[in-house]
């Protein structure tokens, strides 16, 4: 009997039950229960046989629970069909015969027994008609409708207060609260999704948290940070750049650079991916793009970071391009071109900077490449950068006195920033792995924190380097350098 097959069938039965595929789950449960039954017949040891029977009993209980769920769902299917035809048959007879006669009758308005919005409007028309006839009949209807008119006045005052509050929020004059974007004309769910999933204010990433990349930091300061500090200087031909494209292999710190820009500027940071700006409904993706840029202008100064922009704005006109994808690209290009134009006459400090990152710059559309006026290369870390990155990654870990980070930095040449972080993480776990080797779960739980806080040694790094290889090849680096020679704009 294959024990691995028994475990696999039990696991699949539980997974299918969690996913709601109860029929498949019941099949796996039946199979594993029969397998355990056959396995128990071949066991001679009573203690082991008792444990297997206990496991079989637990699986039987789970199987019964799944069966009860299936029977409950089946009962819903049986009970629902007769309910709907009854209601559908009742409504056609009730609506034309009962409701139409009282609706045109205007005698129900004066008693004011109920006060829905439907009855308030006829009352206003009656009062206007009475006033037109003469002042004689004015006292009687007014005395009967004092309370509704008072409630309307209160509603109007409350509405006025809400409008004033909204204006104050937009002007930033309320009591230190963050202004709220008014998504009039857009679906409320779309606005809430962008607010919830994209907007992150004051990300806590600073320049010092990023090792090396001094040239990239310098250019980003000039393109984004300095126009915020010197708005009077960056005007006319010196206007801020519309967009910056960061090109480089994966794991070199492009996303962290964008977050550092948002932190140093004190701007609102929009982190956008292809899943954020796509929808299965026709025309909704373009609305999301337009809504994103309108929200960015509202929360200005703003940094819009579009990660993996090649997945959104690949080349147009290819044979496999879909119409919906083309419309999204067109809307994005229009909005990006409109960022500078919309802000030329506004306060220069209220700018919207578009940062983009990609690992495949050769797939980007030509029109988008023109709008991203600065195109900078984010390379692999240098020897100095690798040593700095090791210090940043290991600042919370105790190191052995014999470790020299410069020697380790020489051994990890060709590693990206993400690769180096993985090496540091794996090396910092080596001491813990040695300490818990051979211990039972109870003994592991009983270990104190001091026993696990052991220094990282040189041998730990050597073991980690044997397990983790670099993720970027020399051929990839050559492609990036060739593209930068042709299209770079640093």
Curated annotation (Swiss-Prot):
Superkingdom of origin:
Eukaryota
Q: Which InterPro entries match?
A: AAA+_ATPase (IPR003593), AAA_lid_3 (IPR041569), ATPase_AAA_core (IPR003959), ATPase_AAA_CS (IPR003960), KATNA1 (IPR028596), KATNA1_MIT (IPR048611), Katnal1_chordates (IPR028594), KTNA1_AAA_dom (IPR048612)
Which residues, renumbered to this chain, carry the PTM Phosphoserine?
Answer: 174
Task: Give the UniProt record's GO annotations in the biological process aspect.
Answer: microtubule severing; spermatogenesis
Q: Where in the cell is it found?
A: Cytoplasm, Cytoskeleton; Cytoplasm; Cytoplasm, Cytoskeleton, Spindle pole; Cytoplasm, Cytoskeleton, Spindle
Citing just one GO molecular function, the answer is: ATP hydrolysis activity
Quote the biased-composition stretches of kind Low complexity, using this chain's numbering.
Answer: 128-139
Chain positions covered by the region annotation Disordered: 96-182
Matches recorded under SMART domains: AAA
| Class of enzymatic activity (EC top level) | isomerase
What GO cellular component entries does it have? centrosome; cytoplasm; microtubule; spindle; spindle pole
Q: Which UniProt keywords apply?
A: Acetylation, ATP-binding, Cytoplasm, Cytoskeleton, Isomerase, Microtubule, Nucleotide-binding, Phosphoprotein
- Comp. bias intervals (Basic and acidic residues): 116-127, 143-169
Q: Which reaction does it catalyse?
A: n ATP + n H2O + a microtubule = n ADP + n phosphate + (n+1) alpha/beta tubulin heterodimers
Q: Which residues bind ATP?
A: 248-255
Q: Which Pfam families match?
A: AAA, AAA_lid_3, KATNA1_MIT, Vps4_C
- Tell me where in this chain the PTM N-acetylmethionine is found: 1
**Might you give the EC number(s) for this enzyme?**
5.6.1.1
User: What family, per the record?
Assistant: Belongs to the AAA ATPase family. Katanin p60 subunit A1 subfamily. A-like 1 sub-subfamily.
Q: What does this protein do?
A: Regulates microtubule dynamics in Sertoli cells, a process that is essential for spermiogenesis and male fertility. Severs microtubules in an ATP-dependent manner, promoting rapid reorganization of cellular microtubule arrays. Has microtubule-severing activity in vitro.
Subunit structure and binding partners:
Interacts with KATNB1 and KATNBL1.
Protein name (record): Katanin p60 ATPase-containing subunit A-like 1
Which species is this record about? Answer: Oryctolagus cuniculus
What lineage is this protein's organism placed in? Eukaryota, Metazoa, Chordata, Craniata, Vertebrata
């Amino acid at each position: 009997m294959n024990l691995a097959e028994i475990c696999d069938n039990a696991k699949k039965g539980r997974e299918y039950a969690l996913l709601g595929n109860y029929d498949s789950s019941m099949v796996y449960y039946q199979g594993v229960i029969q397998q355990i039954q056959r396995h128990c017949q071949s066991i001679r040891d009573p203690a082991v046989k008792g444990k297997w029977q206990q496991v079989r009993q637990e699986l039987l209980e789970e199987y019964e629970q799944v069966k009860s769920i299936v029977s409950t769902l089946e009962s819903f299917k049986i009970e629902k069909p007769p309910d709907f035809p009854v209601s559908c048959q009742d409504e056609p007879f009730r609506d034309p015969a009962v409701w139409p006669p009282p609706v045109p009758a205007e005698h129900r308005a004066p008693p004011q027994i109920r006060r829905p919005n439907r009855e308030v409007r006829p009352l206003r028309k009656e009062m206007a008609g009475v006033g037109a006839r003469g002042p004689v009949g004015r006292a009687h209807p007014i005395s009967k409708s004092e309370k509704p008119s008072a409630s309307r006045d209160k509603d109007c005052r409350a509405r006025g207060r809400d409008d004033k509050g909204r204006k104050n929020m937009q002007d930033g004059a309320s009591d230190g609260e963050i202004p709220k974007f008014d998504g009039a004309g857009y679906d409320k769910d779309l606005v809430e999704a962008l607010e919830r999933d994209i907007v992150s204010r004051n990300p806590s990433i600073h320049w010092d948290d990023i090792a090396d990349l001094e040239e990239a930091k310098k250019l980003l300061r000039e393109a984004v940070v300095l126009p915020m500090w010197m708005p009077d200087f960056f005007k006319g031909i010196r206007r801020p750049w519309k967009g910056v494209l960061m090109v480089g292999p994966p794991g070199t710190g492009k996303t962290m650079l964008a977050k550092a820009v948002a932190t140093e500027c004190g701007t609102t940071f929009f982190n956008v991916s292809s899943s954020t700006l796509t929808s299965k409904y026709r025309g909704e993706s373009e609305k999301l793009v337009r809504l994103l840029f309108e929200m960015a202008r509202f929360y200005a100064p703003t940094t819009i970071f579009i990660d993996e922009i090649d997945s959104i704005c690949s080349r147009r006109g290819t044979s496999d391009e879909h119409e919906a994808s083309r419309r999204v690209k067109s809307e994005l290009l229009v909005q990006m071109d409109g960022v500078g134009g919309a802000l030329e006459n506004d306060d220069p400090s209220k700018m919207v900077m578009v940062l983009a990152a990609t690992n495949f710059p050769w797939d980007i559309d030509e029109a988008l490449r023109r709008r991203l006026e600065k195109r900078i290369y984010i390379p692999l870390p240098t020897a100095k950068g690798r040593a700095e990155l090791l210090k940043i990654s290991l600042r919370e870990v105790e190191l052995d006195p014999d470790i020299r980070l410069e020697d380790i930095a020489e051994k990890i040449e060709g590693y990206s920033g993400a690769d180096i972080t993985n090496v540091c993480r794996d090396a910092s776990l080596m001491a813990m792995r040695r300490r818990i080797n051979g211990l039972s779960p109870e003994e592991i739980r009983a270990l104190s924190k001091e026993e696990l806080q052991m220094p990282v040694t040189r041998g730990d790094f050597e073991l980690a380097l044997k397990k983790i290889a670099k993720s970027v090849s020399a051929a990839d680096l050559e492609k990036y350098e060739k593209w930068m020679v042709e299209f770079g704009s640093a």
